[in-house]
Amino acid sequence: IGNIPIANTKIMPYGWRKAAKGRTVWRIVEEVISQGLESRVKQLGFDSVHAADSEVGVFDFRFCYDGNKESYVNIKSAVLGGRTNKDDISKAVRLIDFYKKNPSANLYIATFVISFNDDMTIGLDKCIVFPTAWIPDVYVNPSNNGNLQSSMYKNLRTATKRTPQEFLVVLEQANQVAL
């Protein structure tokens, strides 16, 4: 995909300043990734790629590859060199509903590590793909609208390998604690 142009030094002569944050550009990054995959389905070897119908669902796009079942991807962004925080993954109740309707679904978090370049572009430096069901630190934050949060979803070495149904049990327990 290459760097994503956001602005230029004519309209932002002092650079990024306080705008150099993931929350400033995450939606654009999400769209660039989704549309880039959709427009290059065959070229990239996918059977199909479809954007999510809802902007507030648990995934941003779904895809099929090599005749296998459909998989789902939730796109996140993280700033290169940023500190490790508990980040919002999705609303716990929406994830619970999703896994109840799709008990064997492959749902992934694809985190694009981004950098803010002097030429007012966003660099896509790295992509980390992590199965949602493998999140080791399952925590539902009651003071943050019941969001599933994790600080370890960007490190596969910390993964707790489990099936979607095993994850559903853990998530439901964490959600009960949060209520």
Spell out what each predicted region is.
Residues 1-57, 65, 71, 77-179:
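Nucleic-acid endonuclease domains
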